[in-house]
A protein has these predicted regions:
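Cellulosome-associated attachment modules in secreted, modular CAZymes
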Residues: 548-616
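Cysteine-dependent hydrolase recognition
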Residues: 1-548
Length: 616
């Protein structure tokens, strides 16, 4: 989004070059342009505005930039953009070495209204290898889930396969889920560690003390990032998900040197984007001002990152317990029920539009929605008027697996626009919520996760939420939003929500997918600032809305032991009309797809004849 300039579709493509290579030149060959018949009036990209308390001086400065942009383009008939293709940055995703290019296939002449379409664009990348590079320097990293992400990202993914070692070479140890926490957290974390292990994840809890003693860095944050950079490839641990556990100062977030006039955001995206060491990316000039405009950071996260933003052991244990319970709960009255809280941003921006767009998905045909909009102002029907007391009473009495609100925000709540302008949700809502039915929450508002304050996102994680995605500083919205291509916070909201509710993505994977999509499709106003402020997810990154059935093969009676009682249980089920294993698959000890007498025999051989262990 370039406010004031023609709103033309464009996309950033990631193109792989051989590992170790450095791009020396990028050029573009265009096929013949097609002049579309007629004349066109392409509107300018609108100016996003903050969805909180606006600083009038900052707004006037941004408005002046918008007007200058408009005059510079619409005041002449010069082609816009000047080039169909543009080099954006060097980048990386895990083992892959990438070059980002932006392609805008339409060229607009504002005064005459001519529009030229270029259907064929060839990208040429020249590269060279640095002195001393050898094939031994190539990272070994072959993880099926991450390869599927790479295939989504990389334009020439198939071509790149011949450049890397094949197979599933792994390190001496394998931990695809890493928890970074303060010492003495084993007991509070046990409910989540046990649950993730049952799901098939290989979990390792690593303390900040151990990292600090074994890795170098300017501060603890850099040491943690260096640890993750070292261990994430599959030739080491094969890390895919990272959960940070601790207050912002105990397990530090990274303060970023981006400021839209409302303060610098802290982010956990620093721990997700691991392509290069700090000295070559986040702090390239070594001035310890991370994330400056000059710092060459890319926007493809190597790992999914979430955080439990508490150090208190009792709170951590409670969040771990409800995280496991959330995924185990299969009641559709809960897991397919959404609460939609849509206020106006401005008079032309009713967030009921956003709410209705998000739930218009084929997989939601059997879901239940409870709507609260600004009645008397919104043209959309709702079940309740959007007011504080209504939200508190309805939410606390209901069962909602996903809650979405959109409205002007602060560190402590979100607000309606009309009548009183009151908060419809705030930190004082949380004590009333039923934590037996916590929700994944997307907060489309300013500052709801602002780490300089005791924010509502953190309060929700203590009571009411099992995941929370909000902005760590003042956020931007798009006026008149009615389509995901309009960008800003509403589009991030749309993409995160639709990914999570599809049941195909965990909240951590949905978070990174949505951030990546926003970047590659040019939907941000201030790319670094907004990627950073939306780069902190509260909660377990491996948590999803799909119900997870966990069981141990052979534990037919579900007593957490494999013994002769399981063989007897199976025989009673098969021949005495006894109860069935729950789930039935738990009785399939020999993993042949059937539950029959062979499974009871298999168990007896394992227990008394040194036969192979049950396994799924």
């Amino acid at each position: 989004l370039v406010p004031g300039k023609p709103n033309l579709p464009s996309k950033i493509f990631a193109i792989a070059i051989p590992p170790g290579a450095k791009a020396t030149q990028v050029s573009f060959d265009l096929g013949e342009g097609i002049a579309l018949p007629g004349t066109y009036r392409i509107p300018p990209a609108s100016l996003p505005r903050v969805i909180g308390q606006e600083n009038p001086l900052v707004y006037q400065r941004e408005k002046q930039t918008y007007e200058d942009n408009y005059a510079s383009v619409y005041g002449s008939d010069e082609a816009y953009p000047a080039s169909v293709g543009e080099f954006v940055r060097s980048a990386g995703f895990r083992k892959y070495n990438l070059v980002d290019v932006r392609v805008t296939p339409f060229v607009y002449h504002p005064q005459s209204g001519r529009l030229i379409y270029y259907p064929d664009v060839r990208v040429n990348i020249a590269y060279s290898f640095p002195k001393g590079f050898s094939v031994g320097d190539i990272m070994v990293d072959n993880l099926p889930r991450k390869e599927r992400v790479a295939q989504e990202i990389i334009l020439n993914y198939q071509q790149a396969q011949s450049w890397y070692p094949v197979g599933t070479v792994g390190g001496k140890e394998s931990y695809d889920f890493v928890i970074i926490a303060l010492p003495l957290m084993d007991i509070p974390l046990a409910p989540l560690v046990n649950w993730e292990t049952l799901k098939g994840r290989s979990v390792n809890v690593v303390t900040t003390t151990w990292i600090s003693a074994n890795y170098t860095g300017y501060d603890l944050a850099e040491k943690i990032r260096n640890f993750l950079r070292d261990k994430y490839p599959s030739e080491q641990w094969g890390i895919e998900d990272v959960l940070l556990v601790g207050d912002y100062d105990d397990v530090p977030m990274r303060r970023c040197w981006q400021d839209a006039g409302y303060g610098q955001p802290e982010t956990d995206y620093y721990y997700a984007e691991l392509s290069l060491p700090d000295a070559s990316s986040w702090d390239s000039n070594g001035n310890h001002q991370w994330g400056e405009d000059s710092d060459p950071i890319d926007f493809y996260a190597e790992v999914n990152v979430g955080r439990i933003p508490y150090s208190a052991t009792s709170t951590v244990q409670h969040i771990c317990e409800k995280s496991a319970a959330y995924e185990a709960n299969g009641d559709p009255a809960y897991k397919k029920h959404m609460l939609l809280l849509g206020a106006f941003f401005w008079s032309d921006t009713d967030n009921a539009v956003l709410m209705e767009a998000k739930i218009n998905q084929p997989w939601m045909s059997g879901w239940t929605f409870t709507r609260m909009y600004e009645q008397g102002y919104s043209t959309y029907p709702s079940d309740y008027n959007l007011r504080f007391t209504n939200v508190r009473s309805v939410w606390s009495a209901g069962q909602y697996a996903f809650v979405n609100w959109a409205g002007h925000g602060s560190q402590y709540g979100s607000y309606i626009m009309y009548t009183t302008g009151e908060a419809f949700v705030s930190t004082s809502t949380c004590p009333y919520l039923n934590d037996d039915y916590p929700a994944i929450v997307f907060a489309d508002a300013c500052s709801n996760s602002d780490t300089d304050y005791p924010n509502i996102g953190r309060a929700m994680m203590q009571q009411g939420a099992v995941g929370f995605l909000g902005a760590t500083k003042v956020a931007y919205g798009s006026g008149g939003w009615d389509n995901p291509s309009d960008g800003s916070s509403q589009s991030l909201d749309y993409y995160f929500t639709t990914r999570v509710t599809s049941l195909s993505y965990t909240q951590g994977a949905a978070h990174q997918w949505a951030l990546r999509y926003m970047y590659s499709h040019g939907l941000w106003y201030l790319v670094k600032y907004e990627m950073f402020e939306w780069g902190a997810l509260w909660g377990n990154p491996d948590l999803g809305m799909a119900t997870v059935q966990t069981y141990v093969c052979g534990d037919a009676n579900d007593d957490q032991l494999i013994d002769v009682a399981d063989a007897i249980f199976l025989l009673n089920y098969l021949y005495k009309s006894g109860p069935a294993p729950d789930p039935l698959e738990a009785g399939d000890a020999n993993n042949d797809g059937l539950v029959d007498v062979a499974d009871a025999i298999y168990l007896l051989n394992y227990l008394y004849k040194e036969g192979p262990a049950p396994g799924c």
